[in-house]
Amino acid sequence: MSIGANEVFRAMTSIIEQLERTQMGNVSKAAEEMFQSLLKGGIVHIFGAGHSRAFGMEMCGRAGGLAPMKLVGLEDIAALEGTRGINLVELERDPHTAHRLMEMHAVQPEDAFVIVSNSGRNGASNELALECQRRGIPVIAVTSLEHSQHADSRHPSGKKLYEIADVVIDNCCPYGDVLLEIPGLTEKTGSASSVAGAMIAQSLTAEIIARFVQADRTPPVFISANVDGGDEHNRAIVQQYGHRQITY
């Protein structure tokens, strides 16, 4: 079996096509949940640990993105407490981390939460989903069902993320998150979840904006800070959400 750039493109394209073929209904349901929270004056919190943090960066504080989206991460705890002695892997697996993040970000009943975890097994993400469930806050999960269904939960409840969330978007990635065999090795390469996540994130953004337009409302969309007038445009939008610590 050959391996190279062309194989990466073919494998990733296959994942994206599978996403479009199987997950657009779930993307629509998730976008509706998020839109309804925004209509009620809430914001959408987006959590991902490790590489899953990239999903939130696709939706929060960037050109073409909606303003009332807030990135939530393990790094918030590290920044507050200082990096010395902080182990992000341990934080990701500790259910108590979820309660610290909920408090830090002052999550409100009208908000929504997107939780991104390829494996769907770790304590922080699953406890975050459970705590949102307890508070009546809608949870959208972005996860690999194939991986999650072949892995044991690390949460005390024994539950995995897809078993808790209100809406589940399957990123269609395989167990282990890699696509391409390496000749002569058991290891594989071609990590897929970040590429799939970027497509899902941009799809959600577009679906939410479409709902604003259909409702004859102006969507609060950022533009690039590196075009003329970008700072002024974005500053005016951020001021609308300053009480929720939204930044660009």
Model segments located where?
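A ubiquitous structural signal for well-ordered alpha-helices
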Residues: 15, 30-33, 128
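Glycine-rich phosphate-binding loops that contact phosphosugars or nucleotide phosphates
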Residues: 39, 46-205
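Generic N-terminal amphipathic, Lys/Arg-enriched alpha-helix
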Residues: 1-22
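Amphipathic, non-membrane alpha-helical segments in soluble helical-bundle scaffolds
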Residues: 2-5, 24, 31, 126, ...
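A short, well-structured juxtamembrane/interface segment
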Residues: 22-39
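Residue-level recognition of short, well-ordered coil/turn positions
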Residues: 24, 42, 137, 216-217
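YjeF_N-associated NAD(P)HX repair module
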Residues: 183-248
